[in-house]
């Protein structure tokens, strides 16, 4: 999927849903990302619910507050939260799907960004590491 923050309707989706995934990146350890929420109240909880097996079982991680973005153009102040989803190494070799959605709880209400009902979905893949040509004949890789 395209990074949500790069979509032209990102601001309108945030206003409509109250919560919107901003960006996600992957590494060998898992997925990291940012979520924007409308600052409706001081007390709030942001989390990411995810699964590796088509929602037969699920996991949830709390996101942490990162920064506030001041109100502009008549839109409310926005808070940015960060999250990390650990991906077990054994799953990386199975081309497993990781599906997730962002959850925002505030003022007794619950709001979701689940990619318009499709969930955000990534496929775990491994990529062979290629040694730089200048290192191929170096002794350093034997140490």
Annotate each PLM feature.
Residues 1-143:
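Glycan-association/targeting regions that enable binding to alpha-glucans and other polysaccharides
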């Amino acid at each position: 999927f395209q990074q949500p923050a790069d979509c032209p309707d990102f601001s309108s989706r945030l206003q409509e849903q109250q919560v919107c995934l901003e960006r996600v990146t992957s590494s060998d350890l898992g997925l990291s990302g940012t979520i924007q929420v409308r600052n409706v109240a001081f007390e709030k909880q942001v989390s990411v619910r995810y699964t590796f097996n088509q929602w037969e079982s699920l996991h949830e991680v709390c996101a942490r507050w990162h920064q506030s973005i001041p109100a502009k153009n008549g839109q409310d102040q926005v808070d940015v939260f960060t999250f990390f989803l650990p991906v077990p190494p054994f799953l990386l070799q199975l081309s497993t799907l990781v599906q997730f959605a962002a959850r925002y709880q505030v003022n007794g209400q619950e709001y979701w960004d689940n990619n318009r009902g499709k969930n955000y979905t990534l496929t775990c893949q491994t990529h062979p590491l290629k040694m730089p040509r200048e290192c191929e004949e170096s002794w350093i890789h034997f140490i």
